[in-house]
A protein has these predicted regions:
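Flexible, glycine-rich phosphate/dinucleotide-binding loops
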Residues: 12-13, 46, 143, 181-183
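Helix-loop-strand module that forms the ligand-binding subsite of alpha/beta enzymes
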Residues: 69-153, 157-158
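A structural motif corresponding to the C-terminal end of an alpha-helix
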Residues: 29-30, 81-86, 132, 163-172
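N-terminal beta1-alpha1-beta2 submodule of the flavodoxin-like/Rossmannoid cofactor-binding fold
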Residues: 1-105, 112, 196-205
Length: 205
């Protein structure tokens, strides 16, 4: 089985961040069963993700500059990494009620017409492997699936489910480590419960 791990914490090399801590645990557990794991740490300067601009819309319409050629090649690399993976694990903190910007940049490079989806009359059809599973591990200070103030702001989960559905992937497992900043909560207990849930999920693959 080929695994793609996507780490999406802006503080990308801080192992004390809960998102990074869970990603490290997840990889340790996955390596007990699988050795074909590709990791993209989106905020690491060594992990280049092309940014959406006017040139990205015109790759096929003109002679490309060296930078545009490099961006197109990188986009093709990212597409191939995704297409060849059997499972995708995403580790991300919630930021301003939505996904972080580098993850959106990644999505802009893989959600491409006639590559991962096609347009038909009044609908879109995903072209990726429908048996592929995405696991979205999201950390947050608030409680977004239960708190009355936040349930209608749970955009990140809706976005991840929706965008992967567009490309044909409906198997999306959500693992939340939430309420981490609420004073009445036991943060360490929340993290430990999330670890247990993550390990159990990985063992079920």
């Amino acid at each position: 089985m080929k695994i793609l791990q996507i780490l999406a914490h802006p503080d990308y090399d801080n192992k004390n961040r809960i998102s990074n801590l869970l990603a490290e645990l997840g990889e340790e557990e996955l390596r007990k069963k699988y050795n074909n794991i590709t990791t993209l740490n989106l905020y690491d300067p060594k992990c280049y993700i092309p940014v959406m601009d006017k040139h990205m819309f015109n790759y096929d319409d003109k002679e490309l500059t060296k930078q545009e050629e490099a961006d197109k090649t990188r986009q093709e690399e990212l597409l191939n990494i995704l297409k060849k993976s059997d499972c995708v694990f995403i580790y991300m903190p919630l930021h301003n009620f939505n996904v972080v910007s580098k993850f959106k940049d990644f999505i802009d490079n893989i959600v491409i017409v006639n590559e991962t989806f096609k347009c038909e009359i009044e609908t879109m059809v995903g072209l990726d492997n429908t048996n592929k599973q995405v696991t979205f591990v999201i950390t947050s200070g608030g409680e977004f699936d239960s708190h009355i103030q936040y349930v209608n702001l749970d955009f990140a989960v809706q976005y991840v489910r929706g965008v992967f559905s567009v490309i044909g992937i409906d198997k999306v497992k959500i693992i939340r480590s939430q309420g981490l900043d609420l004073v009445h909560n036991d943060k360490q207990a929340i993290v430990e419960n999330t670890k247990e849930e993550l390990i159990k999920h990985i063992n079920s693959l």
